[in-house]
Amino acid sequence: MRKINKLLVAATTTALILTGCVGGKKEEQKVDPNKKVEITYWDFPQFTKDKEFSKTEDFDAALIKAFEAKHPNIKVNYQKIEFTDGPAKIETAIQSKTAPDVIYDAPGRVIAWAAKDLLVPLDDVDKSKLNEAAVKASSYKDKLYMYPQGVAPFLMGVNKDLTDKLGVTNLLPLDKPGRNWTVEEYEKFLKAVKAKDPNITPALFYTKSQAGDQGPRAFVSNLFNSWMTDKDISKYTINDENGVKGLEWVKKAYDEGLLGQGVALEAKDALEAFKSGRAATTILFSPGTAASHASGFNYKFLPFPNNSGKAKYEYLVAGPAIFDNGDADKAAAAKKFVDFMINDKEWGKRTLLASGNFSAKKDEKGLYDSEELKFAEGLTDQFGPYYNTIPGFAKMRPLWFNMVQGVLNGKTTPKEGLDKFVADANKTIKEAL
């Protein structure tokens, strides 16, 4: 891949880079490629699957050491941040103009920063070599602001040991092309599980909070081939005919005891039920959750049932972004570090594998030996529109789970609930613009 920066040239070369203070006016500054520079790098606990370093901070230290060995004029100062309070720390740093030079994150926050003119665009990245969906998710106004390194779909999972014991594995779509199945086939499976053992929840549809809410949203969207937004991600459209049919089916299945009693439960409860064998399937699953919640039994990834014949997936995208801190030398050094962690012959692939994600590069496939990971890796062409970056996304999320609670509790009909949700959710877009 063509390198992000073109500063790796003769020592006497001087380049120009557009930069300025965070959120301020851009101006041209000269860059000395050999000047000693210090940059800061913040990272969440992302890299926990390296064979040598199991802790993110240890892996990041090794990554930095390897980078500094190749770039002795650049020193990288590192800070690990947690998923709990990390986002607040970043916002505080932005307000106090002490934002890190490099952050490894996801588009939800990154694109919000790009919209506020806080980031350096990655104009030299060859986007044609990257997964199109990942590029779209990482861009703002057609400019790339996060270098997508890893992608992974959110899908469903089944405890095959449990279904073997119950004698219902034959009702799963494991031998069908793409493992695709219809709503009718899925319902037949759920009813069979319930009939074999009433103490086991066939699937747990949870809706207490926004934690893991991509699972229920993708579940409802898929059933009859709707989606949360239009393909341009300009408005919410889940109240179309197929979206209403999907939520009507969920209400019916919920009342019949096929989807558990999840009004007062959230994602962690559903995953714990799956992990402990109290639920046969989970509607929130990914390579990452498989490692943490299905290590004790034989699991299989499952597509969402979709009567169109092929499921669509919400998905994770992860990668580094660069804050514009008003220093051209720091920005240039940060680009070198970003390029190293993604494209270095050794550390690019190692960083990706340490995250447990699949590559956003079109030509980097087959990284894992597991049959299940190979299956999940092949789903990238079924990613749906990535709407996590839509303006007002955070305010939409409580509207969703409150609406679904009302439907399941019988306080509103699926159509009435979805119509009001879409009207209110579209207001959050306008309010955020």
Where are these regions (language model features)?
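Conserved N-terminal structural module of periplasmic/extracytoplasmic solute-binding proteins
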Residues: 2-111, 127, 308, 329-333, ...
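Helix-loop-helix "hinge/cap" segment bordering the ligand-binding cleft or interdomain interface
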Residues: 69, 138-211, 227-262, 326, ...
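Extracytoplasmic/periplasmic substrate-recognition and gating elements
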Residues: 69-70, 75, 255-256, 293-356, ...
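Alpha-to-beta junction loops
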Residues: 74, 94-105, 119-120, 199-200, ...
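Short helix-initiation/N-cap motifs at beta->coil->alpha
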Residues: 80-89, 179-185, 262-275
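Hinge/lid segment of periplasmic solute-binding proteins
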Residues: 82, 106-155, 161-164, 184-185, ...
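Ligand-binding pocket segment of bilobal, Venus flytrap-like solute-binding proteins
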Residues: 238-297, 333-340, 346-349
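Long, aromatic- and glycine/proline-rich binding clefts that accommodate carbohydrate-like moieties
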Residues: 302, 350-402, 406, 430-432
